[in-house]
């Protein structure tokens, strides 16, 4: 079941071929002037240049063939050879009926699905998420949903930052602060003889009493500042990090507690944001792979000594800029950040063997990923092109710089979500919405409106661009906003409820009015928007479609009465258009990670 653009492209391709020209010139696109035509084909101009012929003559040949297509009410030439096409009401009605009868409202599945792993969010142990995690989380979640909806076998991995120097900082700071834990750590350099699972449970229970999430939130920032001012503390933290990574028993137990406490809190925040993961693989999961991987890189002749460190050179002939080598082992003998990333690629190949791994990470990390990916290709851990960084810009304040609190600090993600929720409550009351809801229902609706405001404000932009945070604008029920889309969704549900209560039923779609045509054309455009979003790993194409669809329904509803339609047949047709619009709109919203309430 092809959309109109694709099926007309096939017809135009056949027409060009019949005219003795390559079929690829028959590409059809949505019209730049929808007041004049539904679709256009500019292939005659390119074909003329290739064949050294007059473009208008070519267009005449193609149009003469296309005029026999029963789906087209008109095919005309404009200017030097542009071909304009208008679809007949009958063909558009038939296409609308196809979409209405399809559970996916016209969205197709891939002919050749792939295994895809998406690495996104990147939360860290003992560090509350901040606004910088917002874009990674919601863009990654949307891309994951989009790829899964298209038919790919997709795994989303949080890539948990649970290893490295910050762990040594925490261990050292807590041992300084709590004499009991300090003494316990001194007693447990390794598992004592006869140390049972019950003994371990007692130790973990003691940690739960003594170290809460609030403690981690307090201790880590202080330790981070302290290591910059206290060389002795910094050295102890480095030693603790090395001993943890080498398997010191007590440190491993304490580390597990840090991970457990942090993950519970992080999952709660992600749930509030409508984000979930299939995997919570941590950097620690590849720790045991690093040493054999380094030996393997050495055996392949890829490791090079450089001022005491060991590196992999990744520069290529023809590079237009310097591409730095991958630092694998430091001069002190430590594995580096990029080493862990390389080992993670190796681990993913062994455990999942994906055709594609996408990294949804800040655009500022582009150079790092270029280096890591090239090293992975050299080592044979991935096929060329199987690793892709889908970068994004920053969310900025009114000054155009990355968003901060009024005090100049980094805003926690939890606080940002609460700000959006509070503003949504205010907006609902201002608009007189939700008055008939219970307190619990009102809070749930406010949460959905607030999250929709944050998500749509972000996802309506191409991910590579930055945007200015403006909560007043984002939470408005008017304009291009998430709350506007939710309002239109709830409005359609209300129309359908009233229709059901009156006994009205949906029926065969017949298109006659301009507003009906416009709505049906947009329903048909869903597949094209999905294809564009999929190819470019860019949810903004889905967001744009959702907004245009909501706008088109609003105009349709104003111009084409449903319940007071002149005939029962007309009412049934318009009810089907309303039902189909709702289903497609909610599919698009779900791909953006936005949930619509039932009532407002």
From Swiss-Prot:
Where located? Cytoplasm
GO BP of this protein: arginyl-tRNA aminoacylation
Q: What family is it from? A: Belongs to the class-I aminoacyl-tRNA synthetase family.
**Keywords in UniProt for this one?**
Aminoacyl-tRNA synthetase, ATP-binding, Cytoplasm, Ligase, Nucleotide-binding, Protein biosynthesis
Q: Which HAMAP family match?
A: Arg_tRNA_synth (MF_00123)
Question: Which PANTHER family does this UniProt record tie to the protein?
Answer: ARGININE--TRNA LIGASE, CYTOPLASMIC, ARGINYL-TRNA SYNTHETASE
UniProt short sequence motif 'HIGH' region, positions renumbered to this chain: 123-133
Specify the taxonomic lineage.
Answer: Bacteria, Pseudomonadati, Pseudomonadota, Alphaproteobacteria, Caulobacterales
Listed under subunit, the entry gives:
Monomer.
Give a single Pfam family match: tRNA-synt_1d
- Record's protein name: Arginine--tRNA ligase
Q: What class of enzyme is it?
A: ligase
* Keyword Nucleotide-binding found: yes
Q: What is its EC number?
A: 6.1.1.19
Spell out the InterPro entries in the cross-references: aa-tRNA-synth_I_CS, Arg-tRNA-ligase, Arg-tRNA-synth_N, Arg-tRNA-synth_N_sf, ArgRS_core, DALR_anticod-bd, Rossmann-like_a/b/a_fold, tRNAsynth_Ia_anticodon-bd
């Amino acid at each position: 079941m092809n959309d109109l653009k694709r099926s007309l492209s096939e017809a135009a391709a056949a027409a060009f071929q019949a005219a003795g020209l390559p079929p690829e010139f028959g590409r059809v696109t949505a019209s730049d002037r929808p007041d004049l035509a539904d679709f256009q084909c500019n292939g005659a101009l390119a074909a003329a240049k290739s064949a050294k012929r007059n473009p208008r003559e070519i267009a005449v040949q193609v149009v003469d063939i296309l005029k026999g297509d029963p789906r087209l009410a008109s095919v005309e030439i404009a200017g030097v050879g542009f071909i304009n096409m208008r679809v007949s009401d009958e063909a558009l009605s038939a296409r609308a009926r196809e979409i209405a009868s399809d559970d996916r409202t016209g969205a197709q599945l891939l002919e050749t699905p792939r295994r895809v792993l998406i690495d996104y969010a990147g939360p860290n142990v003992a560090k509350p998420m901040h606004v910088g995690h917002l874009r990674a989380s919601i863009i990654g979640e949307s891309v994951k949903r989009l790829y899964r909806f298209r038919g790919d076998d997709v795994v989303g991995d949080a890539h948990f930052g649970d290893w490295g120097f910050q762990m040594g900082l925490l261990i050292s700071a807590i041992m300084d602060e709590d004499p009991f834990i300090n003494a316990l750590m001194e007693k447990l350099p390794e598992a004592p003889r006869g140390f049972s699972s019950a003994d371990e449970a007692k130790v973990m229970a003691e940690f739960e009493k003594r170290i809460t999430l609030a403690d981690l939130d307090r201790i880590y920032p202080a330790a981070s500042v302290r290591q910059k001012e206290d060389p002795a503390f910094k050295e102890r933290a480095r030693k603790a990090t090395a001993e943890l990574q080498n398997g010191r028993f007590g440190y491993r137990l304490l580390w597990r507690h840090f991970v457990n406490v942090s993950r519970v809190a992080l999952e709660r925040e992600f749930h509030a944001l409508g984000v979930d993961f299939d995997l919570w693989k941590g950097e620690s999961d590849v720790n045991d792979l690093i040493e054999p991987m380094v030996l393997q890189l050495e055996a392949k002749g890829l490791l090079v000594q450089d001022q005491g460190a060991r590196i992999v050179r990744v520069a290529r002939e023809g590079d237009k800029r310097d591409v730095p080598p991958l630092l694998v082992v430091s001069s002190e003998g430590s594995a580096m950040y990029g080493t862990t990333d390389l080992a993670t690629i190796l681990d993913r190949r062994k455990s999942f063997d994906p055709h594609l791994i996408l990294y949804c990470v800040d655009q500022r990390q582009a150079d790092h990923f270029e280096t890591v990916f090239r090293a992975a290709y050299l080592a044979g851990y991935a096929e060329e092109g199987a690793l892709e960084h889908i970068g994004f810009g920053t969310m900025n304040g009114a000054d155009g710089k990355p968003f901060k609190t009024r005090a100049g600090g980094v805003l926690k993600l939890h606080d940002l979500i609460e700000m959006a929720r509070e503003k949504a409550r205010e907006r609902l009351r201002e608009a007189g919405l939700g008055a008939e809801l219970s307190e619990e229902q009102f809070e749930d609706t406010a949460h959905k409106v607030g999250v929709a405001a944050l998500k749509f404000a972000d996802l309506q932009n191409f991910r590579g661009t930055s945007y200015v945070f403006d909560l007043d604008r984002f939470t408005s029920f008017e304009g291009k906003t998430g709350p506007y889309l939710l309002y239109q969704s709830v409005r359609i549900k209300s129309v359908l409820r009233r229709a059901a209560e009156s006994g009205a039923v949906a029926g065969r779609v017949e298109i006659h009015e301009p507003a009906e045509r416009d709505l049906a054309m947009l329903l048909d455009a869903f597949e094209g928007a999905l294809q564009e979003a999929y190819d470019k790993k860019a949810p903004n194409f889905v967001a744009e479609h959702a907004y245009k669809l909501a706008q088109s329904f609003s105009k349709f509803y104003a111009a084409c009465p449903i319940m007071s339609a002149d005939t029962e047949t007309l009412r049934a047709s318009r009810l089907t258009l309303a039902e189909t619009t709702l289903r497609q709109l909610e599919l698009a919203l779900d791909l953006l990670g936005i949930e619509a309430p039932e009532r407002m």
